[in-house]
């Protein structure tokens, strides 16, 4: 057996460490390069080298974690493959990454690693040669039988395939043209074998051993094809083509070698995907689209970018819950108990949820209503939505809409775009796996708007019970039924929600909590939760209700309970430190007692008198349990109080009045201050005021000027023209906060009346209401939140418009008992209630008109 042109590899080779795939002599493989050592090798040898020798590498398979950048070189496999780098493809952005196309030349054995950094270089010993033999070359006698047997099985395997496939025809020609010594490595790299089996073939240096190990692999492949042909009934010649391509996906002849892309697993996935599509319960339209796409997918090469897009699309279509749903639990009594146990107060909201459950019990095919909980932060809107899902026994999914400004987030991106994906609605359905979950659309009032569209407009179809049974996501491009989904939205205010979207939702107001409700919530839910989170027990800490009230009034001013929860958490952390220190000191004291007793025995034996032992006076005794949290402890833990009852001090001079304002965070009290000085009759307004509030100020001064004689109001010069040589400055404190709205009109009038009459406004009175130029008081919104704010501030009387009297029914009974309400229809009634002794009309004597 003579060789014509043997290949001699260098005695020193740079080593390329791989962990995916095994390169055999005569085969071609693509491998990714992303580890630091391999990147240095590519840059130094392949990108900068110009000689043929610089393109020859030593490929070491089965390297554990070659991508690791550890300092030490990982254990190396004993035998590798000398390879020729045929192609280098890659880039340095966003991070360096290269792909190598390498062709195996021969086996080698590592003799000694000469260098490890920046990439390993080893002294190697060539084990075999890839040589070209003439076609008339005879095999050695001892290998003749094995060679003939191997050749017979190889020909049988190829003839079972479709010879019309170019790759199969090329393989048949290679069996006759290539030397028999090269066939075991080449066929092993083509047929379906595991990396472990390929590694065993690589380690088989003896040609006889390679023949013996490869023949069973060929037999196994032949039996598998026979079984596949029996189980499949060929309808067309295309079926045979599919069978042929399955075991041999891609065969390329490069310098007498073959390439196997090892894509069998992907092909099996396509078969399973097709089976799932045919057995799925998706609608007819969606099924037709999927069948069409799977046919296109079969014809695509996997290298096409559209292949991955189409496959991802089909996998999503199969995973969507077209007809899968959960059974509702409609036990009204259990639902009522669950709602009462988990949420204190909130009677109106719980009543509406129970009404929905009752109607569902009476009529199963009820279209899901669109509920919108509107209220300040921290009152439990999101947790109620989660509780509704728990009560019904449905899956729950939260979609955060705050800051979303692209309508594609709702409807999805069209598949023509790179990186396209379905919208949040379809993604949520895929996540929960059922078609009747509870979807919580959180912060729907904070949707944005941009050049990419208006997501609020995209929600119109989602939240319309008359349309959402035919919701079409841009990514799916087929209709999906959302009518069984229960949508619950949350918002802090309805002012920023578009009118069309607001019309599709049932608004349920969730007001803030009263002080009594906060105390009850703290002791029912917040304190036990904080104790559990901090590893404390009720025997270690005691927080009386008086302390809780101090936290609410002096350290938090909010409609919800989030700040209260944080303050309780701070208290528990401080107590946890004390408890841990006490346990440490107890253990230290115990050790000191033992040492003291042992030391006493020794000294008594020596002197019959105990000497001084280790001093334990520096060890403070552990705190007594439970630790009581009082006002002094609050001051030590939380610092000085953040809020004080300063209402009476701030109303100690004329020209100050208290109004009531509504914000998305709940109700607040609002001071209005006025002063006058010599000037040219100008009105100055400060405090970040909106246009509506500025107009209210002008209305107030105009009404007072027109009624100055009626109330005997004069400026500093005794003129009834209040702006004659007089400037007025109106200020609304908290200047960093934007303020607007008409409800401050009565407060501005009262403040100016106090200024010009030089009388003090009652310090326990707050007011709200819009005014007109005729002196009428018009109704305003947010009465409940405003009244609760007045109650939190310790006020005793609230002046509201008469037409808002109906809103007092929604105020808790204990708040109504603590406050007195004055309903006013005109400014005369407001002024009479705001000042001690009233604000009566003054008439000058002698101005009696007689008709006699």
From Swiss-Prot:
SMART domains: AAA, LON. ATP binds at residues 375-382. Signal peptide: none annotated. Keywords: Acetylation, ATP-binding, Hydrolase, Nucleotide-binding, Peroxisome, Protease, Serine protease. Residues 651-837 form the Lon proteolytic domain. A motif (Microbody targeting signal) lies at residues 850-852. It catalyses: Hydrolysis of proteins in presence of ATP. Residues 13-222 form the Lon N-terminal domain. GO terms for molecular function: ATP binding; ATP hydrolysis activity; ATP-dependent peptidase activity; serine-type endopeptidase activity. GO terms for cellular component: peroxisomal matrix. Its EC number is 3.4.21.53. Belongs to the peptidase S16 family. ATP-dependent serine protease that mediates the selective degradation of misfolded and unassembled polypeptides in the peroxisomal matrix. Necessary for type 2 peroxisome targeting signal (PTS2)-containing protein processing and facilitates peroxisome matrix protein import. May indirectly regulate peroxisomal fatty acid beta-oxidation through degradation of the self-processed forms of TYSND1. This is Lon protease homolog 2, peroxisomal. It comes from Pongo abelii.
């Amino acid at each position: 057996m003579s060789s014509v042109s043997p290949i001699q590899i260098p005695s020193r080779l740079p080593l390329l460490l791989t962990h995916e795939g095994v390169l055999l002599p005569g085969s071609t493989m693509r491998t990714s390069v992303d580890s630091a050592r391999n990147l240095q090798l590519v840059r130094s040898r392949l990108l900068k080298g110009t000689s043929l020798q610089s393109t020859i590498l030593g490929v070491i398979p089965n390297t554990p974690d070659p991508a690791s950048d550890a300092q030490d070189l990982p254990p190396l496999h004993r035998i590798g493959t000398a390879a020729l780098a045929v192609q280098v493809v890659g880039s340095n952005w966003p991070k360096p990454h290269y792909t190598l196309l390498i062709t195996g030349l021969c086996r080698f054995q590592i003799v000694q690693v000469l260098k490890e950094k920046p990439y390993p270089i080893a002294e190697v010993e060539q084990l075999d040669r890839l040589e070209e033999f003439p076609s008339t070359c005879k095999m050695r006698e001892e290998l003749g039988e094995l060679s003939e047997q191997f050749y017979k099985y190889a020909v049988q395997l190829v003839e079972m395939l479709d010879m019309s496939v170019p790759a199969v025809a090329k393989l048949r020609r290679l069996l006759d043209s290539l030397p028999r010594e090269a066939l075991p490595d080449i066929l092993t790299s083509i047929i379906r074998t595991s990396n472990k089996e390929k590694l065993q073939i690589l380690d088989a240096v003896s040609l006889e051993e390679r023949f013996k190990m490869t023949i069973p692999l060929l037999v196994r492949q032949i039996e598998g094809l026979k079984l596949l042909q029996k189980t499949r009934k060929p309808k067309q010649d295309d079926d045979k083509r599919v069978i042929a391509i399955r075991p041999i996906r891609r065969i390329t002849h490069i310098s007498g070698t073959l390439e196997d892309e090892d894509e069998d697993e992907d092909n099996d996935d396509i078969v399973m995907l097709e089976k799932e599509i045919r057995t799925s319960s998706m609608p007819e339209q969606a099924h037709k689209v999927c069948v069409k796409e799977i046919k296109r997918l079969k014809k695509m090469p996997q290298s096409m970018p559209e292949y991955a897009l189409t496959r991802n699309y089909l996998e999503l279509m199969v995973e969507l819950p077209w007809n899968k749903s959960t059974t509702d639990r409609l036990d009204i009594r259990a639902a009522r108990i669950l709602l009462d146990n988990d949420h204190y107060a909130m009677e109106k909201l719980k009543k509406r949820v129970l009404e929905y459950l009752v109607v569902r019990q009476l009529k199963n095919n009820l279209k899901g209503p669109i509920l919108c909980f509107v209220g300040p932060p921290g009152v439990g809107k999101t947790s109620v939505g989660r509780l509704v899902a728990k009560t019904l026994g449905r899956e729950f999914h939260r979609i955060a809409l705050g800051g979303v400004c692209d309508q594609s987030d709702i409807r999805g991106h069209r598949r023509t775009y790179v990186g396209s994906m379905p919208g949040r609605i379809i993604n949520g359905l895929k996540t929960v796996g059922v078609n009747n979950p509870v979807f919580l659309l959180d912060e729907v009032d904070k949707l944005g708007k941009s050049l990419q569209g208006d997501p609020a407009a995209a929600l119109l179809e989602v939240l319309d019970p008359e349309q959402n049974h035919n919701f079409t996501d841009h990514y799916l491009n087929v209709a999906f039924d959302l009518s069984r989904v229960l949508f619950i939205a949350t918002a802090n205010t309805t002012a920023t929600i578009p009118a069309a979207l607001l019309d599709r939702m049932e608004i349920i107001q969730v007001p803030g909590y009263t002080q009594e409700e906060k105390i009850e919530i703290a002791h029912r839910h917040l304190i036990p939760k904080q104790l559990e989170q901090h590893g404390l027990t009720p025997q270690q800490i005691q927080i009386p209700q008086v302390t809780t009230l101090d936290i609410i009034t002096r350290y938090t001013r909010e409609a919800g309970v989030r700040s209260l929860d944080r303050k309780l958490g701070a208290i528990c952390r401080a107590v946890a430190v004390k408890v841990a220190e006490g346990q440490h000191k107890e253990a230290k004291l115990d050790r000191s007692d033992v040492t003291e007793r042992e030391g006493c025995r020794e000294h008594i034996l020596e002197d019959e008198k105990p000497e001084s032992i280790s001093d334990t006076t520096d060890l403070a005794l552990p705190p007594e349990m439970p630790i009581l949290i009082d006002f002094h402890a609050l001051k030590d833990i939380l610092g000085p109080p953040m809020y004080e009852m300063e209402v009476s001090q701030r109303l100690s001079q004329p020209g100050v009045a208290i109004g009531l304002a509504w914000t998305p965070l709940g109700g607040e009290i609002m001071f209005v201050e006025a002063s006058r000085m010599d000037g040219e009759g100008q009105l100055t307004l400060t405090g970040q005021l909106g246009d509506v509030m500025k107009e209210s100020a002008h209305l107030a001064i105009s009404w007072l000027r027109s009624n100055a004689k009626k109330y005997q109001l004069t400026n500093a010069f005794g003129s009834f023209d209040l702006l004659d040589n007089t400037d007025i400055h109106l200020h609304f404190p908290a200047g960093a906060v934007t303020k607007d709205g008409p409800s401050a009109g009565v407060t501005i009038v009262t403040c100016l009346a106090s200024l010009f009459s030089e009388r003090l406004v009652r310090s326990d009175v707050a007011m709200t209401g819009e005014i007109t130029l005729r002196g009428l008081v018009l109704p305003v919104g947010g009465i409940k939140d405003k009244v609760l704010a007045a109650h939190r501030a310790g006020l005793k009387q609230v002046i509201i418009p008469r037409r808002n009297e109906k809103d007092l029914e929604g105020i808790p009974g204990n708040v109504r008992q603590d406050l007195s309400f004055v309903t006013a229809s005109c400014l005369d009634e407001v002024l009479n209630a705001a000042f001690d002794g009233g604000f009566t009309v003054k008439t000058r004597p002698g101005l009696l008109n007689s008709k006699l």
